[in-house]
Design a protein with these regions (language model features):
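Conserved P-loop NTPase nucleotide-binding/switch module
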Residues: 202-263
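P-loop NTP-binding catalytic core
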Residues: 60-127
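N-terminal accessory targeting/assembly segments
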Residues: 1-76
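Hydrophobic anchor at the beta1->P-loop junction of P-loop NTPases
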Residues: 130-132
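Conserved P-loop NTPase
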Residues: 85-98, 256-273
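Hydrophobic positions on the alpha1 helix immediately C-terminal to the Walker A/P-loop
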Residues: 143, 147
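Conserved lysine of the Walker
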Residues: 140
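P-loop NTPase switch/communication element
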Residues: 151-198
């Protein structure tokens, strides 16, 4: 059962154009839609726990490793963020306890989501590496997925390092989302490990990955670039100036940055790096 079907069974009829569901203990359900916000009924603490259990297939233990990071990903690519009391051993998270809220981000396949920048990926016949940049919830993952599909359809061997299971939503190793006919996916492991394995195993022409952030990710992508592989990736930033202050994110791997606009699917700026 897909995530929206599960939520509808748990919460009743959902509004159309749904992008995100936020459920907070003792507060009204909040629905963020393409045309604005809606609010639903109050979610008591015991019901919030029941909804979390149902989304996790009544096996929170199996999701323990993900929950320590504050989220888990559904089989169709939707991500369930979990907030509450995080139990730590020093600086190492060991468990998520006393759940206070859930944030379900709806995974969407939108053909054409990359149209605003796809042409800029090419300089003549040469493909360039690009970093897709925006704040949260403005379509970076959707645009990356669509670009991977289109490059794959256009003849490139594409590899996806899908740490959070959101780009391809693999089930038993097979993508549930359309990422193209020439695409291979390594999912469920840290990006820097996946990139290294893909270089060895799949002879990629293009590597696609989501939300790079630390130096290990950037160094793995730098090694891929040295091998002649083009990179498409995303990073959180509110502006290209903010991005420039975080050189560790891209380490000269990328030829251009694409800043998405204030609405999903809109491109605000494309700049050479």
């Amino acid at each position: 059962m897909r995530t929206l079907e599960r939520l509808e069974a748990l919460l009743g009829a959902l509004p159309s154009g749904l992008l995100e569901v936020r459920l907070r203990s003792g507060k009204p359900a909040q629905y963020r839609c393409a045309d604005g916000e809606r609010f639903g009924e109050v979610i008591p603490p015991e019901r919030l726990r029941a909804i979390l259990a149902a989304l996790a297939d009544h096996s929170l233990y199996a999701r323990e490793a993900e929950l320590k990071q504050g989220y888990f990903t559904m089989d169709d690519g939707c991500r369930v963020g979990v907030c509450g009391r995080l139990v730590c051993d020093g600086e190492r998270p060991t468990a998520m306890a006393d759940i206070g809220s859930l944030c379900v981000r709806v995974c969407r396949e939108i053909r054409g989501a990359c149209d605003g920048f796809y042409g800029a990926l090419f300089e003549g016949k040469s493909l360039r590496s690009a970093l897709i940049v925006s704040g949260p919830g403005l379509g970076k993952t959707t645009a990356l997925r669509d670009a991977a599909r289109r490059l794959s359809e256009d003849g490139y061997n594409v590899c996806i390092a899908d740490e959070r299971h959101e780009l391809a939503a693999c089930a038993q190793g097979v993508p549930a989302l359309d990422v193209g006919p020439r695409t291979d996916v390594m999912d469920g492991c840290p990006k820097h490990i996946a990139v290294t394995r893909l270089l060895r195993a799949a002879s990629p022409q293009v590597i696609v990955t989501d939300e790079i952030g630390d130096r290990r990710d950037a160094e793995a992508l730098q090694e891929a670039a040295r091998c002649g592989v083009r990179i498409l990736a995303s990073a959180h930033a509110g502006s290209l100036e903010q991005l420039a202050a975080r050189r560790n994110v891209y380490l000269d791997v990328f030829d251009l940055a694409v800043l998405l606009g204030d609405e999903p699917g809109r491109v605000k700026e494309i700049r050479a790096l």
